[in-house]
Amino acid sequence: MGNPGNVVRRRMSGPERRRQLLDVGRATFAERGLDGTSMEEIASRAGVSKPVVYEHFGTKVALYREVVAEEMERLENVIADSISRGRSRARIERAVVGLLAYVEDHTDGFTILARDPVSNQGFATLLGNATGRVSHILGAAFSRAGLDESPAVLYSQALVGMVSQTAQWWLDERTSQGLDKETV
């Protein structure tokens, strides 16, 4: 019978350790930004030595880029899945709720994408792509209704901008305002 005071710790595999460092890095970058984060802090929070972090990523910027790439892919998938099927209005509503669900479920990732100037270019590109997709959806809906399609570009810019800004506001205010994503 083992001593209950002795805890046997299993050593993490390389992929498990990498995943842990990405998760710790994401949380730290969201809290402090790229410039305010050090590899020492990431190592300390992960309970490893600094050389272990460098072994997996080489540099702080490389770790940051990988975190940003994961979050961009995750958010792109949310948007793409939301607008891939259904009627125009339902597709856009699903995209809005999908974005808010992403903010709720991946707060650190959204904070990095939307607020850190280093990753903001990628977020701007993602919003530009979303605007293009929404423009096509609105243009097709306008055409089916016998309306001029040309305002679709303007309306899509307004809609995507409004939703993006609302998501950033909700990130800060959802708890104090008591607002869930369905209400927003």
Specify the residue positions occupied by each region the protein language model found.
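Basic, helix-initiating cap at the start of DNA-binding domains
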Residues: M1-R32, G36-G47, A62-R65
